[in-house]
Regions:
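N-terminal, polar/charged subdomain of small-to-medium soluble alpha/beta proteins
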Residues: 1-92, 97-100, 104-150
C-alpha cells in the first residue's frame, strides 16, 4: 500500500462538476493498493498518517500532528501510485490491485484513518473520474510505502 500525503490549506473532490467532499486545513491523502495489501498495511499506514508531525508548532518547527492542530483528512483512491515506468513510455499498472480487492481495502483504510483520527474523514469516490483541487501548505509532500520501512 502506498500513500502520498500533502499538507493542505484546503482540498476538495468533485465528480462531473458536483462537489463530493471538501476539507479545510489538514491532509490530502492519495492511496494506492496492491493485491498483497491487508489489515496490517491499513493499520500501520492509518496510524502513521495521523501521527506524522508535519504541522508547525508555536516556534515554526514541524512538531505537531493532524490531530493536535484539529486538521481534517481527505482520502482519495489512486491506482496510478503503483505505476511502473521501467519499460517504454506507457506506464504499467500491473501492480495495482483489481477493484474486487482494492475497493474494500480502500474503504477499510478510510475507516481506519477515521478511527486513528478520532472522527470521520472525507473521501473521494472509488473508481470515479475525479477532479481534485487543493492548495498546498508549505508545500509538504510525503510518500510512504508499507513495504518499505524507512
Amino acid at each position: 500500500m502506498r500513500i502520498l500525503i500533502q499538507r493542505v490549506r484546503r482540498a476538495s473532490v468533485s465528480i462531473g462538476g458536483t462537489l463530493k467532499s471538501a476539507i479545510g486545513p489538514g491532509l490530502l491523502v492519495f492511496v494506492g493498493i496492491e493485491a498483497e495489501d491487508g489489515e496490517e498495511d491499513i493499520e500501520r499506514l492509518a496510524g502513521k498518517l495521523t501521527r506524522l508531525r508535519i504541522f508547525d508548532d508555536e516556534n515554526g518547527v514541524m512538531n505537531l500532528d493532524v490531530r493536535q492542530v484539529g486538521g481534517e483528512i481527505l482520502v482519495v483512491s489512486q491506482f496510478t501510485l503503483h505505476a511502473s515506468t521501467r519499460k517504454g513510455n506507457r506506464p504499467s499498472y500491473i501492480k495495482a490491485a483489481p477493484e474486487a480487492i482494492s475497493r474494500p481495502l480502500y474503504e477499510r483504510f478510510a475507516a481506519g484513518v477515521g478511527r486513528a483520527l478520532g472522527r470521520e474523514v472525507a473521501t473521494g469516490e472509488f473508481g470515479a473520474d475525479m477532479q481534485v483541487e487543493l492548495v498546498n501548505d508549505g508545500p509538504v509532500t510525503i510518500w510512504i510505502d508499507s513495504r518499505q520501512r524507512e
